[in-house]
Amino acid sequence: MLEHLKEQLIEHGFVLKQRSSQEVFQKIVNTEENKYILKLVKLICTFIQNFKTNGYTVEKFYEWESQTTNERTRLFLDVCQQCYHEYAKRLKEKRAVDFEDMINESARILNQQLISGKTLDFKYIIVDEYQDISRQRFDLTKALGKICDAKIIAVGDDWQSIYAYAGSDITLFTKFKESMGYGQELKITRTYRNAQEVIDIAGGFIQKNDSQLKKALVSPKHIQDPVVIESYTEEVDRKQTKGKGGKYYMIGKTVEDIVDTILEENPKSSILLLGRYGFDAYNLSRSADFIYDEKTGGVQSKRFPGVRLEFMTVHRAKGLGFDNVIIVNARNELYGFPSQIQEDPVLKFVVKDDHSIEYAEERRLFYVALTRTKNRVYIVTPEQHPSKFVTELISDFKNVKVNGKINEVDDANSANIKRCPICGYPLQLRYKPHYGLKLWICSNEPEICDFMTNDLRGGELSILKCDKCQDGYLIVKEGKVEPFLGCTNYKSDKTGCSGFMTKDYYLKYIRKK
């Protein structure tokens, strides 16, 4: 077809010039669609890294393609496979090896040496942070254990397994005996960082995950008011907050008041500000009360300029401890805590998700946040949109102190959040002047999922341009038997455009595209 098109263009006087791949790439990235290209590149890089972290071979691409009927997934796997081969080719040309291949090749070589009868003289293999182990590192550990005939000591805490996005598989820890073929479990139940009251709350919270191993931790330390919820109102006088950060003003003021409370009790206290995302620190600095140094992670309070405050994401703070901890954004929203962002559907092939409970990984992450403190945890949350983790703590534990009001009804409503029937992302209700309607719109990236509807009863039916009149839109309408798509230009007196589409036709021919 391309050759025929080329012949026709030349025949009609067009001068064709072959462009290099680099020129084509530059042409694409210099357009407005560049952001989509960069997101695709990032997605492919993440996929390939996790693909190799799982120890998969190229045959997996063919296996997955044969198992899916989703056209987008098939296209992605095809493109990703070509990128995978090109990446492998470049590594070979440069006589280079990446980190994932170092581990995979090491496991392969050890298994080859074992077959040839060679051995290594090690009696013990100790693996720390075992809860974050990936399949490839497990394969390396197992191969090393076999060739040495060594005892494997795996040290870790499954309650703190928070790196599924990077390839870790929690079941390799929780089902250690099954995966290794043998084993004895020895529990370390005594801790010295957290007070018993913090442990009881954090432990009760995390063990709602059915996939977690059950244990009871004990500490010699005790404290009153181990977890303090500090709520703030978002309904502030705009004139009063003008030039002070607008909607971020109350967050900054609340954090400042908490710092003041901590310093009154201990002027030398180390204070950690914890965020779910890195931009939580940037948002805090927009309150006009704080200055954030992104390079060092240091935060300076204008009210307490001599006090050293440190900001970290929860992932970065894992393993560290501070006198007091402030979780700065416990809000019920897409980028709140728990995060309601869902990964691209294609990553399900290479990321091991824990579906034992809603937000299982986020729950472990929140547990890590709670246990960074040596004394108290302060949680900053809005009155009207509190994190569902916050309302759960208040409901389940009587010694969680609440300063301010909490509208728990919001959390109940959030449990019924409307989700896209195509990709599962939350739906947002917006008025769109272009259509003259309030529409439910998928919050996913438009190039990934463009679902929108005027009526959720239509299921997967999404608004389309009307091909018949080229002026109206096909929106969900209620039929005698089931919903269908009908043109907005059709009038109640049965005049106007009669363009329509049945649900069966839409699902069979349109949605598949």
Where on the chain are the PLM-derived regions?
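Conserved RecA-like helicase ATPase core segment
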Residues: 135-236, 339
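Inter-lobe coupling/hinge region of RecA-like P-loop helicase motors
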Residues: 183-190, 211-257, 261-275, 309
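Helicase C-terminal subdomain and adjacent C-terminal extension
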Residues: 347-357, 364-368, 374-458, 500-513
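A basic/glycine-biased coupling hinge at the interface between accessory DNA-binding modules
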Residues: 1-97
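Conserved helicase C-terminal RecA-like lobe
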Residues: 266-270, 307, 316-382
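Conserved helicase motor "Helicase C" RecA-like lobe of SF1/SF2 P-loop NTPases
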Residues: 279-296
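Short, cysteine/histidine-rich loop/knuckle motifs that typically chelate Zn2+
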Residues: 422, 444, 448, 467-471, ...
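Conserved helicase NTPase motor core
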Residues: 69-175, 190, 194, 319
